[in-house]
């Protein structure tokens, strides 16, 4: 049953005549009659009795009019809901972000979005990049903030990756560590130190840098939590490399931070499925994250 023809039938029933419905719809009378005949053929019975004074509903016509009224109500509700979504009067965005972004970039973006569009809800899930991409591919989130090192580009088949900015990676040692007082410092100088590493991508970056410096680090501790990592460093249990955003999110008072171009940079950005940028609420959050 064609919904369009069902709504035309409803217009005729409400107007009481084919000519009246044609005027209401802005159609020609023959076009309305043609759709009515096609609808009656599809249901296999007469829906209207035509007469000089207009039309009269048959019993099947009265039954069908109830359904046609319900369809019209549902379509009107859909139009209103879509209008609200388009105007950002309502909406929801499910966002995944790695820990340091979730502590710095994301709160600012959500606050900015809320100030402009208070009826948009953002649901945040903390996830490292591989897990965030899995969530995207599974349809469990709409948007992800992820990072990539130059030696480990974001692999996003079927997804759109938009880099936002780069951030330096810093060496972090205890405040009383001799390396923190050196004017010139290389990773090679720390070849004999115990190392603390983080997530898989960060760990791979550290191992690659150390290999380029001519040694394999003695990894003693593994943690994705930059607070845990800095506390371990602060009490002399190892040294580590951390991106600037992790140090902006939390800076232990008993660590020394040294930045150098040789420690590399990390690029962060936004990933989403193709077409998601056309969803109003998602597009609004992307703008805030990119600001």
Task: Locate the predicted segments by residue.
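Alpha-helical linker/hinge and terminal dimerization helices associated
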Residues: 42-43, 64-86, 147
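Short helix-boundary/capping micro-motifs
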Residues: 11-26
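Hydrophobic hinge/microswitch elements
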Residues: 128-141, 147, 201-256
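Secondary-structure junction motif
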Residues: 147, 179, 193-213, 278-286
